[in-house]
């Protein structure tokens, strides 16, 4: 119980910092939203995905891109706390050591939820529609939370070990780029063989395919198990 209480206090501290500068949440949501608008209104007409509205195909990948962008801020916040000596100060106090990290992790989850909601609202305005029911939406939420949790624990590593702010955030760049080499924007069968092999065997593709299947009542096959395995595996390794 003490660990939970300590975590809730430190989570509240991190959330208050974010609420004082909500522009960080908005900024992280705006960049993926701008990419979504560009692909839908500039490139969407030239991309054949088998859907009536390209935003329906695109949305899962945009959400994953937003999550990857957002966790860079988690690494930066951790780095800032380390540089200011707050970690050492917390560890000298009678609080659970794990609660310091869990406070940041929970803040990442909540702030990502806010960003995702903003993105979905914009997608609805430009034509996104889903046939998913409550169970499917809850399943999508669960997968996104698990993916966010996995990447957040990855972000903890550079946050604690980086030598500069740029170093703390730089790890997220490859993660942001991964959706571009996946099924997030175009079907993988349109890609050259070497690229297709990579795209079909990296985590974003299985997660995107799972979310897309849940949102539009399409067959998922083994994608959901592969997606869960990736998320759990990344979390355990991190």
Predicted regions and their residues:
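Aromatic- and glycine-rich beta-strand/loop motifs that create alpha-glucan
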Residues: 1-31
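Transmembrane helix-loop junctions in multipass membrane proteins, especially transporters and channels
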Residues: 40-49, 78, 85, 120, ...
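Transmembrane helix segments
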Residues: 39-46, 159-201, 205
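Short, membrane-interfacial amphipathic segments enriched in basic
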Residues: 1-11, 151, 194-205
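Hydrophobic alpha-helical transmembrane segments of multi-pass membrane transport proteins
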Residues: 34-39, 55-126, 171-174, 179
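Alpha-helical transmembrane segments and their short interhelical loops
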Residues: 97-172, 219-238
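Membrane-interfacial helix-loop-helix junctions in multi-pass membrane proteins
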Residues: 17, 48-49, 182-236
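Residues that define the loop-to-transmembrane-helix transition and helix capping
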Residues: 22-23, 56, 98, 166, ...
């Amino acid at each position: 119980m003490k660990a939970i209480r300590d975590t809730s206090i430190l989570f509240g501290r991190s959330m208050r910092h974010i609420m004082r500068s909500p522009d960080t949440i908005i900024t992280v949501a705006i960049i993926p939203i701008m990419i979504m608008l560009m692909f839908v209104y500039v490139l969407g007409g030239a991309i054949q995905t088998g859907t009536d509205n390209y935003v329906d195909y695109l949305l899962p990948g945009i959400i994953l891109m937003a999550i990857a962008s957002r966790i860079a801020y988690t690494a930066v916040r951790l780095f800032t706390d380390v540089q200011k000596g707050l970690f050492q100060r917390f560890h000298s106090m009678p609080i659970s050591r794990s609660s310091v990290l869990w406070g940041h992790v929970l803040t990442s989850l909540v702030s990502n939820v806010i960003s995702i909601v903003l993105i979905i609202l914009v997608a609805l305005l430009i034509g996104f529609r889903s046939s998913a029911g409550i169970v499917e939406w809850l399943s999508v939420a669960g997968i996104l939370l698990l993916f966010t949790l996995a990447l957040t624990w990855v972000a903890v590593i550079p946050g604690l070990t980086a030598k500069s702010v740029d170093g703390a955030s730089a790890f997220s760049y490859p993660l942001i780029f991964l959706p571009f080499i996946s099924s997030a924007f175009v079907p993988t069968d349109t890609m050259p063989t070497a690229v297709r092999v990579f795209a079909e065997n990296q985590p974003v593709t299985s997660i995107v395919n799972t979310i897309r299947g849940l949102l539009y009542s399409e067959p998922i096959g083994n994608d959901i198990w592969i997606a869960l395995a990736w998320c759990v595996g990344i979390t355990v390794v991190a």
